Amino acid sequence: MVKGFNVFIVLFIWRVLLGIGIGGDYPLTATIVSEYCSTANRGKLMAGVFAWQGFGNVLAPIVSIIVTACFMSKIDADVLYLDYVWRIIIGVGCIPGVATLYWRLTMADSVRFQNISANTRASSMESTRADEEKLLATETRNTNSISESNNEVAQSPLMESNRPGHTKTFSQHFSEWRHLKVLLGTSIAWFALDVAFYGINLNSAVVIDAIGFAGDLYQDKPSHFIIRNCVGNIIINILGSVPGYWITVFTIERLGRKTIQLMGFGVLAVLYVILGFAYNQILAKSTGAFIFLFSLAQLFQNFGPNVTTFVIPGEVFPTRFRSTAHGISAASGKLGAIVAQGGFLQLTNIGGHNAWIDHLLQVFALFMCIGFLATLWIPETKGKSLEEISEE
């Protein structure tokens, strides 16, 4: 028997590579848009770039429906044909990335970053000249003592790096509490959001199944069950996610980033408390009411912290640290996603099939409160230049 790779190992390897790419794209996108835009429309354009995720969230289940429909008769006869379906769907996801690769590779650094780099090089050259002059003066004064001169040469700053490394200057900057609390605020807020955001969105099929919208897996045809799940995702995204993104785009310059983030976390905490503690009662009375409240939560995720946790780290940090600090904030969010996925899978079925979903929603409410508190450490950036915000 010929043995091949375990499919989960292969997926894991490629997802790690995908994560490296996305891990670089998040801070790069936010930083470039932030540094290219004027103060008046910076937040709007940053939110607009991020809002295209909403269309991707709708397009993904549409592609899934189309591919499933193409294999419908074969899937219903043998579910192993789903192996073709999910591979094709993942392959289609490569197309947008490939389409934008050329422009991403040829995109120039912002003027702000180029100026910082030029100033750093000029400062380094001036430091070198000063060190050389100091060294020559030292040698002149100590011509009668070779050993003393050699000692001075060995200890001269010229022998060391003329410019502190990025890690050192980064550490020095964030060793001050007034700077560190901002980084902690953006990181903790993103972490708290993604626990709920990915806990729900990576498991939306579980939620759709729990409320009975997807039908019965054991009685319906497999293709019908999959398509109903996809339709459920489309409905939730169209009702909640997509409008939420674009409401933020058109209000972020008027309401402010911090205001939207605080409002979003606050409303989400209330909605998850309602959905969590009244879960069974709501479902018993009306599935439609649950879908409405669930979609409302999706709305305030995006007319709220899902957009602003991306925008704010692209504005609040100095140019020389902006992409690094944004990357740390985004990585904190993805750590929250890992916690959410692991916790959701482990806890969902405690006490029976989907029996613990109500308690998970209650846990998500707690994390929304944590995100709200972390946001208090973050300054408002509306109407301020990047230099004003970071005090450069």
What are these regions (language model features)?
Residues 1-392:
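Transmembrane-helix signature of 12-pass secondary carriers
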